[in-house]
C-alpha cells in the first residue's frame, strides 16, 4: 500500500458522524470563537471539532469528560469525527464549562435547521414536562422548621461553650497568668460555622417568601388584624407564576398547518387563577408588600445545601427527589423539539404559555393545535390560546384512558351555558378531540424516553439552575440533530 487509508473509509457512508459533521458546520459558533478574541488566546483545538465531539458523545449517552476521552482513543467513529485528535478530559471539561451557555443556545439553531429542511410543521405541538435529578441528594436538604430548631440548638451549644471557655480562661489565668486566647475552641468554631450556614439558608427562604416564591403560613404583624386566630395562619393563594409577556413582532412565515406569527402570546393570570389539578401544584404566598407584610416561610419549605436552586419534586417512580423540571414542546409530525425550558418550579402549568411563545419565537410560526395533560390546564391559559386561534386540547382533570375511550361521543350542538372547562371536557369526548389528544402520548413522551433512557440522562452533571438549563437545551439540540439524521434531512 503506497498511501495510508482515508479515515472516512473506517465507517460506513450512512453513519451519523457524517451528518453531525455537516450539521455542526452549518451552526454559527461565533459566541464560542469570540471568547478567544481580544487577548483571549487561541483555542487549543478547533471549536467546531470540540462541538462535534460533544454532539456525538451525547448522542451515544456519554457525558463524562473522562469517558469521552476514552472514546477518542477506542471508538473508531469518534476518532474519524475528531480527525484523530485526542483532547484530554481536562480540555473537554474546561471547554464545556467555559462555553456552556453558548452550547445550550445551539438548540435554537437546530430548530432553524429542522425548519430549513422542512421538518417543522407546527400543525400540532405536544407539550409535557419530566423531572430530571439534580446533582444533589435530597438528604442534603433541610426544612425551614428544622433550620429554626437547629439554629436554636446551636445557639444554646455556642452559649454553653462560651461559658465553659470563659470559666477555663479564668482558671488558667489564675494558674498561668497571661496566655494567648485568640483561637476558638474546636467544638465552638464548628458550631459557629454551622449556625452561620443555616442562618444564611434561612435568610434565602425568607427572601423567597417575601417574593411569593414559597408557601407562606404566617404574616406575623398583621395576623390579628386579619382575624387569623391564635395560630396566626392565613389562607394561602395559588399563584400562577406566569410572567407578563412583552409584545414581540415576529417575521411572517408560512408552513404546513402553521400561521404567520402575530404579536407574542401572553396572559397575566390572577392570583386565584383556575388550577389544573396537576401534580405538584402547591400554593405559594402572595408577594409581601407594605410595612406590615412580614412573612415567614412554611416550616416544610426546603433548602438544599449542595444545589440550592434544585427542589424536592415528585418523580414518575411515585417518589420524591431533588430535581429540576425539564419542559419541551414537540412537533407531532416529526418529533422535533421546537421549544425547551428548564426550571425549579414543581408545577407544570406555568410553563405552558412561555413554551408556546418560545416555539413561535424559534420558528416564526404559531402552532395550529396544542395538546398537554391536565397539569397544564387553567381557564385563563385555554382562553389565551384560543384568542390567538390556537386550538387547545388540555383536559381539566386527569384522564383515565380506559373509561375515557369507552365514553360515547357527544351528539348535537354544545349547550350555550357551558363554561371553558365544560367546553373542553366535551371537546375531548368527540372523536376528533380524542384523536388529537392521543397525539400527545405518541409525540412528547417518546422524546423523553429517548433522551432519558436511550441516551441515559438520569441526572445533571452540573449544579445550579443556569448550568442545568444549558445542559437540558444542549440535550434537546442533540436530539434534534439525531432526529434530522433519521428523517434524512437535506438542506437546500
Annotated model-derived regions:
Residues 1-5:
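Short, contiguous pre-domain boundary segments
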Residues 6, 14-16, 25-29, 46, ...:
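Poly-acidic low-complexity segments
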Residues 9, 58-61:
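Short, aromatic/basic-rich helix-turn unit that serves as a nucleic-acid recognition element
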Residues 78-83:
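Secretory-pathway/luminal and periplasmic proteins that interact with or process carbohydrate-rich
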